[in-house]
Design a protein with these regions (language model features):
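Radical SAM/AdoMet-radical enzyme domain recognition
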Residues: 75-94, 102-221
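Radical SAM enzyme [4Fe-4S]-AdoMet core and its adjacent flexible, acidic
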Residues: 163-170, 180-374
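Radical SAM enzyme core and accessory elements
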Residues: 1-32, 279-452
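Conserved alpha-helical substructure of the radical SAM core
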Residues: 2-131
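A generic structural signal for short coil/turn motifs at secondary-structure boundaries
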Residues: 64-67, 158-162, 228-229
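Short, solvent-exposed loop/turn segments at secondary-structure junctions
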Residues: 51, 155, 193-195, 224, ...
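Short loop/turn segments at strand-loop or loop-helix junctions that form parts
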Residues: 46, 58-59, 150-155, 220-222, ...
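Short alpha-helical segments and helix-capping/turn motifs at coil-helix boundaries
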Residues: 27-28, 41, 133-134, 201-204, ...
Length: 452
């Protein structure tokens, strides 16, 4: 089923011309000639340190891991990727460690926003967000282009202790509430583990559906990199295991049938689905409204393509491009093209969402405030992201990966490049080329102190 949703990939410019080295060694010189996908998301690890020591951290971050990447070096890596991506990056993720502890975090964000970077995602544990009013105001100031990926694993004390090593229930609740009130779009990022919190998946999905400006949830099964290397490779939560749990845990509100594979990457790398709240207050999925077969036809993913004489070639192309735009790593509810995408899909596929169509039209002529409010309460994006480790690594997935981590060629003053996320986390020689790991070898400025 997942493999039915593969779409053609986009070409990229190799970091080193003529790099035909074998995988994964090729990535020590950046993206090679065999890579089949460009960069949808560029992830920059701006510090190796964190104010938590999470037992399941794939990056092995902790308060003892000093290493702060100078702002100029972060920007140099981003600029190198911009040059490879024809001057534009759709999604930049700032990560770590805990990126909000970087003493120049605000400067980095503002300098990034001066570039043609459409959206900035901040991967955070939420501690500073829950406690620092000035920082929250900074995020609110930039809420049109800055979004938070908030670690949110569930609601039980045992869940928090297993994944984060501390009781963070109040902090997580405060962070969600404050971000919602500030109008900052947030994705709840859930690390899900068998026997720990795999029975809380439905509750986290419901929180996303019920909370304004929580744009959705990203469910990530625990994988064996970093401090998770002790995970049992034969007894673990899987991609399809998460899909199977959605229906029973939401009483059928969201099921595996509401998601598809992400067409732009390898079909085993991500499932995605949109939930839309109708004018009657009912949640329906984009897939459920359009239908699986019709959606595949609109995407030109089936042999018998649309042959409806009522649909012109131009309209078919418009709908296809809009749907591919939605079903992409580059898309989220803060993307400036979201109004156009949903208007094209809703009008052309006859979804019966009159208010959504009208406000999408208003947004296209400059009235974005009401459309943002509608998106905040009536459109949610659910993704399942099963990252690979050494037990599950597939070369074909690496070659089609579109989530790339900024790296350098073995030294802080070396050439800037990038490599696929899963390879960077799993293979020690490549992990050592992350900007934050290279910065650990140097004298670094002190981090901000924000404790749980």
């Amino acid at each position: 089923y997942l493999e039915e949703w593969t779409a053609p990939t986009k070409r990229h410019t190799p970091d080193a011309a003529g790099n035909w080295d074998a995988t994964p060694a090729a990535y020590l010189r950046g993206l090679g000639e065999m890579q089949t996908q460009h960069t949808c998301i560029l992830l920059e690890d701006i510090t190796a340190a964190c104010n938590l020591t999470c037992p399941t951290c794939f990056a092995d971050s902790s308060p003892s891991r000093a290493g702060t990447v100078p702002a100029d070096r972060v920007l140099a890596n981003i600029d190198q990727r911009l040059a490879r991506e024809n001057g534009r990056i759709d999604v930049l993720m700032l990560s770590g460690g805990e990126p909000t502890l970087h003493p120049d975090f605000e400067e980095i964000v503002e300098r990034v926003l001066e570039r043609d970077v459409v959206r900035v995602l901040v991967n955070s544990n939420g501690i500073r967000i829950a406690k620092d009013d000035a920082f929250l105001r900074f995020l609110e100031k930039h809420n049109r282009r800055v979004e938070i990926y908030l670690q949110f694993d569930g609601f039980r004390l045992e869940t928090h202790r297993a994944h984060r090593g501390a009781d963070l229930r109040r902090i997580k609740a405060d962070a969600v509430r404050r971000l919602s009130e500030a109008g900052v779009f947030t994705t709840l990022t859930m690390t899900a583990s068998l026997g720990v919190n795999d029975d809380e998946i439905g509750d986290v999905v419901r929180l996303a559906l019920d909370t304004p400006f929580v744009g959705g949830v990203s469910i990530q099964p625990q994988f064996g990199s970093g401090r998770s290397t002790t995970i049992d490779p034969l007894n673990r939560l899987t991609h399809t295991g998460v899909l199977a749990r959605l229906g029973p845990q939401t009483n059928g509100l969201v099921t595996w049938r509401d998601l598809t594979a992400l067409p732009c990457s390898h079909p085993h790398c991500c499932s995605v689905g949109y939930m839309l709240r109708t004018d009657k207050g009912e949640w329906k999925s984009l897939v459920g409204i359009i239908g699986h077969d019709q959606l595949k036809a609109r995407l030109d993913l089936v042999a018998n393509r649309i042959n409806d004489p009522e649909l012109s070639a131009q309209l078919r192309r418009l709908v296809k491009e809009a749907l591919l735009g939605l079903l992409s790593e580059q898309s989220s509810l803060t993307h400036p093209s979201i109004a156009q995408l949903f208007r094209d899909v809703c009008e052309s596929c006859d979804l019966g969402l009159s208010t959504l169509i009208r406000l999408a039209g208003d947004a296209l002529i400059g009235d974005t405030k009401r459309f943002r409010q509608l998106v905040a309460t009536r459109i949610k994006r659910i993704t399942i992201k099963p990252f690979m480790d050494m037990h599950t690594m597939l070369e074909e997935r690496l070659l089609q990966c579109c989530v790339h981590v900024g790296t350098q060629r073995g030294a802080p003053d070396a050439e800037h490049q990038c490599a696929p996320f899963c390879a960077v986390q799993a293979w020690a020689p490549l992990s050592g080329t992350k900007l934050a790991e290279l910065a650990r070898r140097e004298h670094t400025v002190p981090l901000l102190s924000v404790e749980a």
